UniProtKB/Swiss-Prot annotation:
Cell compartments where the protein resides: Nucleus
Family: Belongs to the WD repeat ESC family.
PROSITE patterns: WD_REPEATS_1, WD_REPEATS_2, WD_REPEATS_REGION
Protein name per the record: Polycomb protein eed-A
InterPro entries noted in UniProt: PcG_WD-repeat, WD40/YVTN_repeat-like_dom_sf, WD40_repeat_CS, WD40_repeat_dom_sf, WD40_rpt
Length: 438
């Protein structure tokens, strides 16, 4: 992994400059609440991620949604587009993540991934986006799909994990500006990376090889592999830890969502042993757990690829290529999620967030740090922001953010930790910064 050369500058994080073309209109006057229909350009399907299978609106044999639609009313949040950039590789940007491990007063830093490039930026208060560092993989055919932030538990340095089409996880230290570790094990592309909410060393990866893997990046051990007998039957596209880090929900191309508990005695022991493992004191390799059976599984929520899943308390938010994010829970409404049995066949759909023109796959939504806002972009550059604080979920309010020049598929969004900035990345290599007005 080499760096793009250039001028070093720096706060805490050294800066490396590369050529970036900036959008000529970097301070547009358009507020996100206006001109709902100003975007009308269709974007072509990106060749790097294949087409979604035909999604019939009324597939036979499927029941109608359990509850009514979550109607969108005027949202209390308002955003303004203040800046945009275009990365010079002109390839789709698949991932963006703000570093939420920074302290109050620290620079607001986010990372983007696309092509064989990983780029770090800093958001300045006046709307500027400053390029900090850029890393280029030695293999021109690498295509990074996902990134995730953590920190070194010994030095407190920020660390960034990235992965993509080659199935190699790379850990970058932006302070020393080096790729300090890499992990090989998945048999195919990696679609998402997630760090444990309470343990900065536990990294979850999900792959095209139908499996999930849990790594300990402090001791460089593979703790567990989730998949096999009752695992996913096709690419795993997304996964998320719950807030306490006791459960994982995964989803994929097999239309299924699967729950994996990592607070079982078996998994707690495996994690503990991964910390105690020292290769210099033993000739034996670390024995990874093979978890073949999920603790719950369903195919009753979606009828197409499930490409994004997130926990919201004990509820699940998931989406397919069906123009809706569905809110649901395993079992019946009154059931305790921690007592759900693997044989449970019931699911309770609580409602859905509807939007339009988003029927290609690998389009991921995000929430802010406090889980008060939900954001998703569609394939023609529109952004939808929902207010999750509404007491009645059926009254979740939505703001639609549009800007005429943003007309390409929005692959992912990310909020700054204080929720003041929303960044979106697109298939045409553009980055869009929206600042919150209220």
């Amino acid at each position: 992994m080499s760096e793009a050369s250039g001028r070093a500058a720096g706060n805490e994080m050294p800066a490396k400059k590369q050529k970036l073309s900036s959008d000529e209109n970097s301070n547009p006057e358009l507020s996100g609440d206006e001109n709902d229909d100003s975007v009308s350009i269709e974007s072509g399907t990106n060749t790097e991620r294949p087409d979604t299978p035909t999604n019939a609106a009324n597939a036979p044999g499927r029941k109608a949604w359990g509850k009514g639609k979550w109607k969108s009313k005027k949202c209390k949040y308002s955003f303004k587009c203040v800046n945009s950039l275009k990365e010079d590789h002109n390839q789709p940007l698949f991932g963006v993540q703000f570093n939420w491990h920074s302290k109050e007063g620290d620079p607001l830093v986010f990372a983007t991934v696309g092509s064989n490039r990983v780029t770090l930026y800093e958001c300045h208060p006046q709307g500027d986006i400053r390029l900090l560092q850029s890393y280029v993989d030695a293999d021109a055919d690498e295509n990074f799909y996902t990134c995730a932030w953590t920190y070194d538990s010994n030095t407190s340095h920020p660390l960034l994990a990235v992965a993509g089409s080659r199935g190699i996880i790379r850990i970058i230290n932006p302070i020393t500006m080096q790729c300090i570790k890499h992990y090989v094990g998945h048999g195919n592309a990696i679609n998402e990376l997630k760090f444990h909410p309470r343990d900065p060393n536990l990294l979850l990866s999900v792959s095209k090889d139908h499996a999930l893997r849990l790594w300990n990046i402090q001791t460089d051990t593979l703790v567990a592999i989730f998949g096999g007998v009752e695992g996913h039957r096709d690419e795993v596209l997304s996964a998320d830890y719950d807030l306490l880090g006791e459960k994982i929900m995964s989803c994929g191309m097999d239309h299924s969502l699967k729950l994996w508990r990592i607070n079982s005695l078996r998994m707690k022991t495996a994690i503990k042993e991964s910390y105690e493992y020292n290769p210099s004191k033993t000739n034996r390799p670390f024995v990874s757990q093979k978890i073949h059976f999920p603790d719950f599984s369903t195919r009753d929520i979606h009828r197409n690829y499930v490409d994004c899943v997130r926990w919201l308390g004990d509820l699940i938010l998931s989406k397919s290529c069906e123009n809706a994010i569905v809110c649901w829970k395993p079992g019946k409404m009154e059931d305790d999620i921690d007592k759900i049995k693997p044989s449970e066949s019931n699911v309770t759909i609580l409602g859905r967030f509807d939007y339009s023109q988003c029927d290609i796959w690998y389009m991921r939504f995000s929430m802010d740090f406090w889980q008060k806002m939900l954001a998703l972009g569609n394939q023609v550059g529109k952004l939808y922001v929902w207010d999750l604080e509404a007491e009645d979920p059926h009254k979740a309010k939505c703001t639609t953010l549009t800007y005429p020049k943003c007309a390409s598929a929005v692959r992912q969004t990310s909020f700054s930790r204080d929720s003041s900035i929303l960044v979106a990345v697109c298939d045409d290599a553009t980055i869009w910064r929206w600042d919150r007005l209220r």
